[in-house]
Swiss-Prot record:
It catalyses: 5-(methylsulfanyl)-alpha-D-ribose 1-phosphate = 5-(methylsulfanyl)-D-ribulose 1-phosphate. The keyword Protein biosynthesis does not apply. This is Methylthioribose-1-phosphate isomerase. GO terms for molecular function: S-methyl-5-thioribose-1-phosphate isomerase activity. The active site is at residue 263. Transmembrane segments: none annotated.
Amino acid sequence: MTDPANTLRSLIFDVDSATNKATLSVLDQLRLPDETMYTKIVNVQDAWDAIRSMRIRGAPLIAVVAVLGLAVDLSSNELTIGELDLISGIDEVKAFVTTKMEYLKTSRPTAVNLFNAMDELKSFIDDDAIKTREEVVSAIVQHAYLMLERDVSDNKAIGSHGADDLLSRHVHPEGVCVVTICNTGSLATAGWGTALGVARELQRRGKLRSIAALETRPYNQGSRLTAYEIMQEQMPNPILLCDSMAASYLKSKGADVCVVGADRVCANGDTANKIGTFQLSIIAKEMGVEFFVASPFTTLDVELESGDMIEIEERPDGEMLESSGAPKGMKCWNPAFDVTPAKYISGIITEKGVLKPSADGTFDVKGFVSMHS
């Protein structure tokens, strides 16, 4: 198995210890798998554009890039530094930074990780102990670096908890057969991955028997990105499926579990994820295949009672039509996400542990969050 730390880097972040200036480059995922190109992020607008255009994507990575982009903007961008030079009071400095945070939130509305990251950072700099502009900038740069490290360690914990849970039931000597959708690996995070991280941990233990990835139309994150990661990691018995093949595959080939990511998990367990996840969950239920969500603890949004309250981002028509061969002038509906009702979910894997439904089939996400906060 190839070491993912040496093969797949969704971003490159560095801080000069002498000057505290930060630099950031992100892997342009729209060019994969044909071309590997990193793009420099020098300000908040660059970070916003990279997120909005889906040059970077994946709920955990979106949050990380937003925070890192802000750190670079404040510490290294001469235009922003010049604007800060014109501000005298600490309250005005914090207000200036908060405006940039609020702008970053507008880049993509569905993933809660972005909002949580900005809110956490705002609480951090609002501390009365931070009294100067230099302390604000230094605190944000330090927080960005710690967030980057935390994302990788959290992802590895997600993989470990997920593998432990699955192997407690699936005892085939060659391991577990996994199906996944979209991309939830190193390219969707700061490293290792969430749902694909569970498969990676199974592989590390010699207990991944096979992995099937849905292509994930219309952006083909499964065929372009997940298949790329699977091949890089030399995962056993890989197979790529059209989205419409999922039912036939589960019926004729069989699988032990579907493991998917999440952009937001509501208080009742309803989960927003990449479009196509909902239908995969229905198929899995019909076929008696377990269906797990793997996501960071920060994806749990107890402020929303159910999936009916989630704002679903809709992408431009062209993103679908240009890759589908449709006739000119055809209209389409292009939601980026759908919501899987909690009743189709077998469990929610986080770095804190695995949340299972109660005897009546409902999830107590609020209780889980309260217990681990």
